[in-house]
A protein has these predicted regions:
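Catalytic alpha/beta core domains of metabolic enzymes, predominantly
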Residues: 85-131
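Active-site mouth loops of central-metabolism enzymes
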Residues: 1-13, 63-71, 94-100, 122
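Alpha-helix-loop-beta-strand connector modules within alpha/beta enzyme cores
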Residues: 37-62, 109-116
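Conserved, mostly hydrophobic/aromatic
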Residues: 11, 18, 29, 86
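Hydrophobic faces of well-ordered beta-strands that scaffold small-molecule active sites
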Residues: 26-28, 58-64, 84-88, 121-124
């Protein structure tokens, strides 16, 4: 078995394991069953609903990072589900051989969306320049 959960069942199992060990907050990256990263709102909805059912009261933090090459609009899809929190990446950085773009207009748009929808940001700082 791979170390990263891909399927809905794997995601719920790993979330429940963390919850049972005392986790109150679970950060969620979503993939298709083959492991391909996705920001598909409906896939997030199904997984987040299943985790909430298995882990009553847990706070979920969906990732808005997605994958390199995704548009800001794609990356923001999970915020359309109005989670309590979501990630807000604090700057551009190298990600393997790719560049993970988080320029000022993108960061402002993400922050604005979160503010308008009462979503608390989890600030993600990948290097010292993001502080």
């Amino acid at each position: 078995m791979q170390a990263v959960p891909y399927t809905i069942e794997e995601m719920v199992r790993e979330a429940k394991s963390a919850f049972d060990a005392g986790a109150a907050i679970i950060h969620v990256h979503v993939r298709w069953d083959d492991g391909t990263p996705t920001q598909d709102k409906e896939r997030f909805r199904v997984i987040m609903d299943a985790i909430r059912e298995a882990c009553p009261g847990v706070i979920l933090i969906p990732s808005t990072g997605g994958a390199t090459g995704m548009t800001p609009e794609e990356r923001l899809q999970p915020t359309e589900l109005f989670p309590e929190m979501a990630t807000l990446d604090c700057g551009t950085c190298n990600f393997g051989d790719d560049i993970f773009v988080n320029d000022m207009p993108t960061m402002r748009a993400f922050g604005k969306r979160m503010l308008e929808n009462n979503i608390k940001p989890e600030y993600e700082c990948f290097e010292i320049g993001h502080l």
